[in-house]
């Protein structure tokens, strides 16, 4: 199976967690896009979705799925999203698609976080994939200096402005042995909006696409 076929398999597998009559939290990226396609087949059974990016909102609406503002939703049963890396503790690096802040906000509200990913995203130690950090533009250089002190090599993601109007620093060369401590340390830097480490709030269920089929891991 190709990588895209594995992504499609886990996207469709996540449908089993969607309860009729509910509002579904939806992530961003190539794997989440497959889940949105699958969700389209249930559009008449669900109330709608809360979206983590303008791109996902557009796709949801094109399939006839109602998109709610998170401020108008009291609770979310599930949030379904991909990951750039996921470790054995269900902690993740996310944000390759620059939607990390909205993703983290929606994940924090959802009762259950379902991570959908192909097997190439599984790692023992997080950090080989560059760690995205969303930053207020005026703080870019100041934040970069602090990230160097934490052992990383930050690189400005040229030409990318997030849906919130901010910039992204991708931090290379990190070996993140304590993801919770690293998430807290980076979030504490003035000017950081959020870091793409999902350690304090990791996934509850991981659906991993493998050549043998979809593997389910429950926290």
Swiss-Prot record:
Its EC number is 5.3.1.6. This is Ribose-5-phosphate isomerase A. CDD domains: RPI_A. The keyword Isomerase applies. It catalyses: aldehydo-D-ribose 5-phosphate = D-ribulose 5-phosphate. Homodimer. The active site is at 103 (proton acceptor). The keyword RNA-binding does not apply. It is an enzyme of class 5 (isomerase). Catalyzes the reversible conversion of ribose-5-phosphate to ribulose 5-phosphate. GO terms for molecular function: ribose-5-phosphate isomerase activity. Keywords: Isomerase. One of its GO terms (cellular component) is cytosol. InterPro entries: NagB/RpiA_transferase-like, Ribose5P_isomerase_typA_subgr, Ribose5P_isomerase_type_A. Belongs to the ribose 5-phosphate isomerase family. Pathway: Carbohydrate degradation; pentose phosphate pathway; D-ribose 5-phosphate from D-ribulose 5-phosphate (non-oxidative stage): step 1/1. The gene is rpiA. Substrate binds at residues 28-31, 81-84, 94-97, 121. GO terms for biological process: D-ribose metabolic process; pentose-phosphate shunt, non-oxidative branch. HAMAP family: Rib_5P_isom_A.
């Amino acid at each position: 199976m190709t990588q895209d076929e594995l992504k499609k398999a886990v996207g469709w597998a996540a449908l089993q967690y969607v309860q009729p009559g509910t509002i579904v939290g939806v992530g961003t990226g190539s794997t989440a896009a497959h889940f949105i396609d699958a969700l389209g087949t249930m559009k008449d059974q669900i109330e709608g979705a809360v979206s983590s990016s303008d791109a996902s909102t557009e796709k949801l609406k094109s399939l006839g799925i109602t998109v709610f503002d998170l401020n108008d939703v009291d609770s979310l049963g599930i949030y379904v999203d991909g990951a750039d890396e996921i470790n054995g503790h269900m902690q993740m690096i996310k944000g390759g698609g620059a939607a990390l802040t909205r993703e983290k906000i929606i994940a924090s509200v959802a009762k259950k976080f379902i991570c959908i990913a192909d097997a190439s995203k599984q790692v023992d130690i997080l950090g080989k994939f560059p760690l995205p950090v969303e930053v207020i533009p005026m703080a870019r250089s100041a934040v970069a200096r602090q990230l160097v002190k934490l052992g990383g090599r930050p690189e400005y993601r040229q030409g990318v402005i997030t849906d919130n109007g901010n910039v992204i620093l991708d931090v290379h060369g990190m070996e993140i042995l304590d993801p919770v401590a690293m998430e807290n340390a980076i979030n504490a830097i003035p000017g950081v909006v959020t870091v793409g480490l999902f350690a304090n709030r990791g996934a509850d269920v991981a659906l991993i696409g493998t050549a043998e089929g979809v593997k389910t891991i429950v926290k």
